[in-house]
Structures are given as C-alpha cells and as structure tokens.
C-alpha cells in the first residue's frame, strides 16, 4: 500500500494530465496545475472513490492544494 500522499499525487496526475514532477505539496490545482472548476469536481470525486470517503462540498471548496488534499484525507480517513 502506497502512502496517502503518493496516492493523492497519482490521482492528480491522472485527473489533470500533468507531469508527476509538477505535483508538489504546495501546488495549487487551479493556479499551478491548470485545473478548472470541472477538473476540481472530478478530482474530488476521484479522491472520494480512491479513499472510500465522502468529502462535503463546503470542505471540497477549501481543498485547493495537493497538501490540503493529503491533510484532509489523513484527518478524515478512519474517523
């Protein structure tokens, strides 16, 4: 089992079609990785599926960077 961070980065690469080396913890989905609003919705859906959790819309809006996604999953996984 790979780490949560590795799994999140893999999803970001697949969903946004960016290079793995572009995906850093502080990378903003919109500003740095070129995601639009539809991309971010699909990204959240992919994270929900991968980690078998539900991310409420009001929480999803706060997740704007790779690290925020990792932190959210770490905090809510298994809680």
From Swiss-Prot:
Residues 2-77 form the Carrier domain. The modification O-(pantetheine 4'-phosphoryl)serine is found at residue 37. Keywords: Cytoplasm, Fatty acid biosynthesis, Fatty acid metabolism, Lipid biosynthesis, Lipid metabolism, Phosphopantetheine, Phosphoprotein. Pfam families: PP-binding. Disulfide bonds: none annotated. It is found in: Cytoplasm. GO terms for cellular component: cytosol; membrane. GO terms for molecular function: acyl binding; acyl carrier activity. Transmembrane segments: none annotated. The keyword Lipid biosynthesis applies. Pathway: Lipid metabolism; fatty acid biosynthesis. The keyword Lipid metabolism applies. Its main location: cytoplasm. GO terms for biological process: lipid A biosynthetic process. 4'-phosphopantetheine is transferred from CoA to a specific serine of apo-ACP by AcpS. This modification is essential for activity because fatty acids are bound in thioester linkage to the sulfhydryl of the prosthetic group. PANTHER family: ACYL CARRIER PROTEIN (PTHR20863), CARRIER DOMAIN-CONTAINING PROTEIN (PTHR20863:SF76). Belongs to the acyl carrier protein (ACP) family. Carrier of the growing fatty acid chain in fatty acid biosynthesis. This is Acyl carrier protein. It comes from Alkalilimnicola ehrlichii (strain ATCC BAA-1101 / DSM 17681 / MLHE-1).
């Amino acid at each position: 089992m790979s780490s949560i961070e590795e799994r999140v980065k893999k999803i970001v690469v697949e969903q946004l079609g960016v290079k793995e080396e572009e995906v850093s913890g502080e990378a903003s989905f919109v500003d740095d990785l070129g995601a639009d609003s539809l991309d971010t919705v699909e990204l959240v859906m992919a994270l929900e599926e991968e980690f078998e959790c539900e991310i409420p819309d009001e929480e999803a809006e706060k997740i704007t960077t790779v690290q925020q996604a990792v932190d959210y999953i770490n905090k809510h996984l298994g809680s």
